[in-house]
Amino acid sequence: TAGVVYWEKERGMGMPVIIPEKFKKKINKDSECLANVLRLIQNTESLFVERPEFFPDYTIHGITHIEKVLNYASNLIAEQTMKKLTAKDVSLLIAAVILHDFGMFLTKAGVRKILLGDGRTHRTEHLDKCSWEEEWDAYLKQIKRYSEEKLMYYFGIGTMIISPDLTSNNLSDIDKLIIGEFLRRHHHRLAHEIAIGVLPGGMDQDIFAGTSFTKADKEEIGILARSHGMP
């Protein structure tokens, strides 16, 4: 059925992932847009059935969460506005919803890229005040001043924070929580950078493989994904 993809790993019985009817009707008018959406969902399937590396206690809400956000977006768009949107507009919005939490799934390679590698000085003009290196330094200084109560709330410990050794392959659970909280705070920015390819090694896969999304499309997807965490 057009607009339906099966995610048997998570749901176990081949239950479909449903694109809201308003969106499905629109993208069904353009075979390329429909193909792009379905291929993106297939490319990212594994992310919705695995716990992120830096969130050991993360609750897997997978495609259910994506469906809820898609439905919220669909309900927020008035019918008159919907009539003005093209199939491509809707396909980019769907892609942004799929990508919006991807910053939470950054791997060690991705973290090292933004904090130790060539991504550490990156910032997007007009959107970022600080580079990743500056954001990380500011974050560490902040959490090292936390009260015992705050340390317990965020990290489950009441002792002073020690900066994680990002070069280590044996990060402790506390190290992962510290890194994970940093990713959580900036996951909207990360989603944007993943979409535009600033972090090509951070996801261990090409999420746009087999699609015809252009560079401009990916920028728009990234900005839309980023917007859910912008003031």
Regions found by a protein language model. Name each.
Residues 83-231:
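Divalent metal-dependent catalytic cores for phosphoryl transfer on phosphate-bearing substrates
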Residues 33-50:
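Short alpha-helical hairpin
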Residues 50-58, 173-178:
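Glycine- and acidic
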Residues 17-23:
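Boundary/junction segments of secreted and surface-exposed precursor proteins
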Residues 55-92, 105:
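Alpha-helical phosphate/pyrophosphate-handling elements in metalloenzyme active cores
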